[in-house]
UniProtKB/Swiss-Prot annotation:
Keyword Secreted: yes
Protein name per Swiss-Prot or TrEMBL: Kunitz-type serine protease inhibitor D
Main location: secreted
Entry keyword annotation includes NAD: no
Boundaries of every BPTI/Kunitz inhibitor domain copy: 1-17
Subcellular location: Secreted
Single GO MF annotation: serine-type endopeptidase inhibitor activity
UniProt entry keywords in alphabetical sequence: Protease inhibitor, Secreted, Serine protease inhibitor
UniProt lineage: Eukaryota, Metazoa, Ecdysozoa, Arthropoda, Chelicerata
Length: 17
């Protein structure tokens, strides 16, 4: 439920790879 398009890669982690 987070905007992975705006959060850093460290926050997205598994979502951004």
């Amino acid at each position: 439920a987070v905007d992975f398009s705006k959060v850093p890669t460290a926050t997205a982690g598994p979502c951004k790879g």
